[in-house]
Amino acid sequence: VLEQNKQFGIGMNNELSAVTFGFYAAEELTAADGSVIPVDGLIEIMSLDENGKAVLKSDVPFGSYYVKEISTDSHYILSDEKYPVIFAYAGQEIPVVELAVNDGKSITNEMIYVEIYGMKKDEDGKALAGATIGLFLTDGTEPILTTVSAEDGSFSFTGIPYGEYVVREIAAPEGYVMDDTPY
């Protein structure tokens, strides 16, 4: 499950396609052909479908395994947690076995949040208070958020999902000309 942020349009654009998990042996195992799978041996890299499910294509012996995230979308924190998987005998009449990871509970990816800050100065390099600054998506025409520069010219946007944005003045203080240069 990916954390979503509708305001910034993150988590609803097939970000799951960037998530992969490794399927590892949690104990030394012997395969049907006699080969040994070592502890922490990577057996397969699995991609997620649009529903967040993965399919293990390898034939594996009964035993203890774990999955661990190998890659994720750039907006999210890559987890180093190991999620246990137990593969027990289900009867020889069962051609396909469904394995539950993390006791069947969803694995959640947490978003990376950042702060964007800057200084507004006049043409002489002096701090400029009262400028309205907008934060835009790189292809956006309307600001996602706005703020006003403080007495020392500083401004900031906090709790912003990691990504690429444009910062631009959208209203100048009285007596000044607006600088709409995108940064």
PLM feature spans:
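Solvent-exposed loop/turn and edge beta-strand elements of beta-rich ligand-binding domains
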Residues: V1-Y183
